[in-house]
């Protein structure tokens, strides 16, 4: 919704900390997503495509993939896109779809862990360290090969909202642009579940 990870990517491209990269299109399933506004402000094409507008999930999946193919993208970046990615898209874009998750996978991830629920889970368990993970997307939920992780300390008195903000500022907004830059410059290879990063 808010598009803060998108803004971090836009800033990274403008400041040249992300190189060899341009944003072809921003797609949201939520017509009210501020990410669409952010994209338009920077002259980036913004598209809303929602499963609710289709008679079946299969029809949505087919159109979504067709529209994505039309942009001829090399990399698909998910940031708060809560629609299940069609399996045919995962197969076609194998190790070319990345997602950011606001915990250190394999903790507090998988079905049901999204948004504030992740940080509520971390605080309820009493962990001292949490963070964020950028990973390739596979057929599972948060199960794909891990590209980058960054740890963030949990502090006394944290609320889910405070912790969410700290994880965004200290981890998400740093490692998502970093991962894109590494991939765009051919420094990332995947063997099975393991990502190798060349210097």
Sequence positions of predicted segments:
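One-carbon transfer enzymes
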Residues: 2-199
């Amino acid at each position: 919704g808010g598009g803060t990870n998108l803004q971090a990517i836009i800033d990274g491209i403008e400041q040249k900390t992300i190189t060899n990269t341009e944003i072809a299109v921003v797609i949201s399933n939520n017509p009210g997503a501020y990410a669409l506004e952010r994209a338009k402000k920077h002259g980036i094409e913004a598209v809303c495509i929602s499963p609710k507008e289709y008679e079946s999930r299969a029809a949505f999946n087919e159109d979504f993939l067709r529209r994505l193919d039309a942009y001829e993208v090399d990399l698909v970046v998910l940031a708060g896109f809560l629609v299940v990615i069609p399996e045919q898209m995962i197969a076609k874009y194998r190790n070319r779809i990345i997602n950011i998750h606001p915990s250190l996978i394999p903790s507090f991830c998988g079905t049901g862990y999204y948004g504030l629920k992740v940080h509520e889970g971390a605080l309820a368990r009493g962990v001292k360290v949490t963070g964020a993970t950028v990973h390739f997307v596979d057929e599972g939920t948060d199960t794909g090969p891990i590209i980058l992780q960054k740890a963030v300390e949990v502090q006394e008195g944290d609320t889910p909202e405070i912790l969410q903000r700290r994880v965004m500022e200290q981890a998400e907004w740093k490692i998502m642009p970093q991962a894109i830059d590494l991939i765009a410059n051919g420094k990332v290879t995947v063997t099975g579940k393991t990502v190798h990063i060349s210097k």
